[in-house]
Structures are given as C-alpha cells and as structure tokens.
Amino acid sequence: MDRIVEIEKVSFESEYEVTLRPLTFEEYIGQEKIKSNLKVFIKAAKKRLESLDHVLFYGPPGLGKTTLAHIIANEMGANIKISSAPMIEKSGDLAAILTNLEEGDVLFIDEIHRLSPAIEEVLYSAMEDFRLDIIIGSGPAAQTIKIDIPKFTLIGATTRAGMISAPLRDRFGMQFRLQFYTDNELARIISIAASKLGKNSTKEASLEIAKRSRGTPRIALRLLKRIRDFAEVSDENSISKDRAKSSLDSLGVNDLGFDEMDLKYLDILVGSKRALGLSTIAAALSEDEGTVEDVIEPYLLSNGYIERTAKGRILSFKSYSVFGITPPMHITEEKQNKGLFNE
C-alpha cells in the first residue's frame, strides 16, 4: 500500500527523520505526561548511579517511540544500540547483541512483539539478573552456561502491545502508551522542522498541514517535505496557507486527513449498511488484516469515525453527519439514547 499518509517508516526517510529528531525532552513536543514521568525516573536513576529500569513504549506507529528512546539515552549519558525483533532470529543473535553492550547502555528493540518465544526466554534472565543462560547441547547431556552481562536498559517499542507475552511485558518496569498529537502540537513540530529544512512555514500553513496529518508527527513531516517541493518549484521562500492547501489537495489528502484508502474503507461500511468483520473489510480493500487494523483503523477509531462492536465495524453517527448521509434508524435511535443518558 503506497500512501502519502502511510504511518509505517519508509526506508528513505531514516536520514531525513534523524536530522529533524529532537535530542532532549525540552525539544520534544507532545506526550507531556510521559515526558514528565520519564524526567523523574531518569533523575532518580542518575542520583542512585543506576541504569534506568526497562521501558516499553506502545501505540500506533509514527508517534515518536524511537525518538523517545534516543532522548532517554541522551539524558542518561548512555550509548544506544538499535535493533528490531525480525532481525533477531536466533538466541545467538540476541546473545551477540547483549554481550557487546557496555555498562549503562540502552538497547532499543523495535517491533518487540515479534520476538519468538525462544528469544524471549533468553531475554528474561538478561532483563532481571543481567545474566545470559545459554543451553549447550540437548537432552540429558544438556548444560547451562551462565554469562554475566553489563547492566543495561532495554527499551521495547510495539504497535501491538496485546501480542507481547505476559512474562515479557511484566518485566518492563515502565510502560507508556503514546497518544495521537493535537493539531497545535503538530503545528509547532511542523514550524520547527520547516526552519531546519530552510523554509519558513506560516502559523496558518503549519496548522493546515497539522489538521491533515492524522495526529501523527511522521505523517506531518512527510507532508511538509512534499509541500516544500511544491514551494521550491514555484520559487517560494516560505510556505503559506494557500500553498499548503493546494499542495495537500494535489497529494490527495483532504481537510480531514483522509486519503483514498480511508475513503474507500468508509465507503465499504456505507455500502454494507451493517457491521462488517475485519477479514471482510481487508478483502474488500485488497489489504492484509494487520495493515487494516494497525495502519488504517487507529486514526478512524480515535477520532470517532468508526466503532468496533461485537458484530464488527460500523460507521459512527459522526461519520454519517460529516459526510451528509442519513444514518440507518438503529444508529439514530442509539444516538438519541446516548443523549438521554448524558443529560
């Protein structure tokens, strides 16, 4: 699926994102409660001359989990080693990573929910006792070799917290769910990023981009980069609201942040006039269920455009109202009943 509002990280963006990445909590915009708590925990760990307890970040992609990991390492004065679960295929792969860590290092594992059970088993003793238990051989002749490793901080990131096994999840002393960003927070991020890219973005332009960025910094920065291209081709030194609007319209992103895939998803529900299961929607979109559930639906759910029910996905009353469609009778009655209880 090729979308300008795609949330997953695109390979060519890695270097681009690094140049715009904040290095401290003061530079990091948004996630205020998480930042506040982390500041306390980091200060306490440094005061005790200890490594920070293990941290788990979860939530939709593109909200800053990797950036927060880098900031934690920076605030702790530690080196950070980056890996991802799909790259750790064997116990030996994990052992090689852990034995090469230095005292106080931060190990960041992205997509940690994809670790195999065998890898998780090795990780348990490493997280709790800073020791590797390596089994040599098999059967009655098998032996366990214990290897001490430096004390370190594991930071795990996942978009699917429910897929992490309970034993692994319980070993993270700190667990934080990242929230979608407000338009004002995104507008500030966009203005700062535009300056770093050599373009001034007016307050109105930044807010226009923010409104169409689905509450996600990664999308906001991607849209900004494309709008900058339009501005440069037109020899414009700054990004105005009109430039932002026309560029976003050209990119097929409407004023609600919807692209063609979102509209197709919603159109499927409109046409069905009943609840649809995830597999049915995925088949209609020609996408896998994981992409629909992790990439398309989070924004629609968090903003109240769709609802999950026991029977499946349905359009919310808000969607019928936004798109000027008369809702089915049962939706109208449900809305009226909610209103009675809220009075």
Swiss-Prot record:
Binding site for ATP: 20-21, 62, 65-67, 128-130, 171, 181, 218
Location in the cell: Cytoplasm
Positions that bind DNA: 308, 313
EC number(s) on file: 3.6.4.-
One term under GO cellular component: Holliday junction resolvase complex
Region (Head domain (RuvB-H)): 255-343
Comment on protein domains: Has 3 domains, the large (RuvB-L) and small ATPase (RuvB-S) domains and the C-terminal head (RuvB-H) domain. The head domain binds DNA, while the ATPase domains jointly bind ATP, ADP or are empty depending on the state of the subunit in the translocation cycle. During a single DNA translocation step the structure of each domain remains the same, but their relative positions change.
Quaternary structure note: Homohexamer. Forms an RuvA(8)-RuvB(12)-Holliday junction (HJ) complex. HJ DNA is sandwiched between 2 RuvA tetramers; dsDNA enters through RuvA and exits via RuvB. An RuvB hexamer assembles on each DNA strand where it exits the tetramer. Each RuvB hexamer is contacted by two RuvA subunits (via domain III) on 2 adjacent RuvB subunits; this complex drives branch migration. In the full resolvosome a probable DNA-RuvA(4)-RuvB(12)-RuvC(2) complex forms which resolves the HJ.
Protein name: Holliday junction branch migration complex subunit RuvB
Gene: ruvB
